[in-house]
Amino acid sequence: MLHVKPIIDDSAEKFLSEEGVTAAYTPGVDVALYDDGKMIGAAHVAFATDAAVLEGVYVTPARRGVGLGDFLTRATMDAYTKHLPLFKVAYKSDYFLKFGFEEENDGMTIQSEGITFPSQCGGHK
């Protein structure tokens, strides 16, 4: 069963290292994606005065292509937009356009209040 959990230890860093991913992140919080207790993905969020800043999203290659990256991204955005007016991405990528982000300087940004997630039951559009 899938679940997402914020973590503050170094387990996400170890996971990424074992996956061959090298990144220099600023201090923040990792959000881990687990399937049946095994970490299969991670996102890293740093914090500015007025924004949560997504610095990276990773899903193990064997589990890509089925929407898990979207799931992890949306769960991370949901967790960190409740108390800050902005959610930013530290780099530019067309991937984030579908979430409503706009390019700004070297990254992308969206107003937290503008984030909505469509549901399959029609509750949100």
Question: What feature does the model see in each segment?
Answer:
Residues V59, G65-D78:
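Conserved acetyl-CoA-binding loop-helix of GNAT-fold acetyltransferases
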Residues G107-K125:
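STAS-like cytosolic regulatory interaction modules
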Residues V29, D50, K92-D94:
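A generic "binding-loop/recognition-motif" signal
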Residues M1-Y25, A32-Y34, S119-K125:
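Short amphipathic alpha-helix that is part of the acyltransferase structural core
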Residues L86-E113:
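Conserved active-site alpha-helix within GNAT-family acetyltransferase domains
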Residues A32, K38-A46, A51-Y58:
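Conserved beta-strand in the GNAT
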Residues E55-G56, R64, A79, K98:
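Acidic/histidine-enriched, beta-strand-rich ligand/metal-binding domains
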